[in-house]
Amino acid sequence: MTTEKRQILVTAALPYANGPIHLGHMVEHIQADIWVRFQRLKGNDCLFICGEDAHGTAIMITAQKQGLPPEALVAKMHKEHARDLGGFLIEYDNFYTTHSPENRELAELIYTRLKDKGDIFAKTISQAYDPVKEIFLPDRFIRGTCPRCGAKDQYGDVCEVCGATYSPTELIDPVSALSGAKPIEKNSEHFFFSLNRYTQLLKKWIDAGHLQPQVANKLKEWFSEDLKPWDISRDAPYFGFEIPHAANKYFYVWLDAPIGYMASLKNLSKQRPSVNFDAYWKEGSQTELYHFVGKDIVYFHALFWPAMLSGAGFRLPTTIYVHGYLTVNGQKMSKSRGTFITAHHYLDHLSPEYLRYYYAAKLSAQVEDIDLNLDDFIQRVNADLIGKYVNLASRCAGFITKNFGGKLANELPEPDLYESFLQTEQTITDYYESLNYSKAVRVIMSLADRANQYIDAKKPWALAKEINQEAQVQAVCTQGLNLFKILTTYLKPILPVTAKKVEQFLNCDELNFANLKTPLLDHSVNPFEPLMQRLLPETAAQLTHE
């Protein structure tokens, strides 16, 4: 019986074009990429898109400091971000930008539809203004004490401690991040989206299981009070899209940023005629849509975004997967401690697959922070990847190449052992599907232990010295390499480059779940070449030194 292919669209949150990608960002991109590669390995059609988050005052001010037009800064950061994501083997079908004609068109379309429904209204508000820089201050350029929990040094729109969102005027003891001056209040007409009109729709959507339970419970707390209208406009000077028929007013970056997911697919559909934009975004679509985001942007993705989509006549996400933050050696990343590690700096020193594996070994379906402990990182890479996984192949390959001209035996000596490895497929695929990568890794490494125990028990190195044991040596090593083939298939979403090397070594078709069950018998393999290098402490130490 053939199962129908799933049609899936996956997005990761757009990196902001204001600075380099760091290892904290990579948690999400790696988590999403592993899931996408797993889906493709299962034979599903899975598109993976992202792009540059290109708008906002922060971009404008950074560009001014660098003596660049904002467009030039965005183009530069887009190139750097694409390089770093590619370096970590993140395989997007399209890595686009929100500063695009497609995004402008879609943002205007959604805004117009919401306005025509009566969901947009104008209101004069009192707004923070920097009297020194003579500019209305965006939320992120005001720092102060959170009005909800009292945490100090928080942004003007969202508290990183308790997750509350608020208006900058509610912040306690605010100061301008640009000049240090105390902001003054200045009136300005802004446009608002009536989020409260979508309260019942959002409650129903959240109750329907589209979010992890932790996230759903957190969102339900915000319904204890009426949902407030959302300010979707900003005053000039601003880098972004002008609001139609509203002079000197621009869409707030958080309005057009998630629309960037749609724009990236729209752009991809122009490159690839087989990609049908409406199939993924039209109301009532039977395709699947998954957003991977950090816990700091849940409010925007799980309340504003579904409400906007619904109001504008588009489909809602199937699931929003939320992850926690990254700490390094148990603490928040810090430039002064040398633990603010950029993706580019990491790639200058270490293999991306080491970090892909380490993150996978830590990630679960829970919204938990994960810690990059450098000592544990070294130990995991060397013990698991080198000591268990790669070691299995290197123990067997030499005998096959040297003694048998690269030819595997024509049958498995222990078919039951092989079958027992196959029987874990459902468990492992369930763990991948549910984002419980750490559990999948534990099962895979326990299989690697069993495979190595088999080789330890059979001792092909001793058999090779005995008379008339050639067939037994060939059989044992054939068994070992076929178990290694299964392990490689299971690890392929995490270690795509290594898997490709293994396919070349085994001289076989691309490994996937469809051909998992078929052992390589009476088959010629190529000479074995080292798949990975042991991670030395002095090499890993370079991560925390510029």
UniProtKB/Swiss-Prot annotation:
Where's it mainly located?
cytoplasm
Q: Which UniProt keywords apply?
A: Aminoacyl-tRNA synthetase, ATP-binding, Cytoplasm, Ligase, Metal-binding, Nucleotide-binding, Protein biosynthesis, Zinc
The record's GO molecular-function terms, alphabetically, read:
ATP binding; metal ion binding; methionine-tRNA ligase activity
Place the motif 'HIGH' region on the sequence: 15-25
Where does the UniProt annotation locate this protein? Cytoplasm
Query: What GO biological process, any one, is recorded here?
Result: methionyl-tRNA aminoacylation
Report the cofactor remark.
Binds 1 zinc ion per subunit.
Q: Which domain of life is it from?
A: Bacteria
Q: What are its cofactors?
A: Zn(2+)
Residue positions binding Zn(2+):
146, 149, 159, 162
Query: What sort of enzyme, by top EC class, is this?
Result: ligase
User: Where is motif 'KMSKS' region found?
Assistant: 332-336
Instruction: Give the Enzyme Commission number.
Output: 6.1.1.10
* One Gene Ontology cellular component: cytosol
Q: Which reaction does it catalyse?
A: tRNA(Met) + L-methionine + ATP = L-methionyl-tRNA(Met) + AMP + diphosphate
CDD domains, A to Z: Anticodon_Ia_Met (cd07957), MetRS_core (cd00814)
**Annotated binding of ATP, by residue:** 335
Q: Which family does it belong to?
A: Belongs to the class-I aminoacyl-tRNA synthetase family. MetG type 1 subfamily.
What is the recorded function of this protein according to its Swiss-Prot or TrEMBL entry?
A: Is required not only for elongation of protein synthesis but also for the initiation of all mRNA translation through initiator tRNA(fMet) aminoacylation.
Q: Which PANTHER family match?
A: METHIONINE--TRNA LIGASE, METHIONINE--TRNA LIGASE, CYTOPLASMIC
What binding partners and quaternary form does the record give? Answer: Monomer.
Question: What's this protein's name?
Answer: Methionine--tRNA ligase
Q: Which gene encodes it?
A: metG
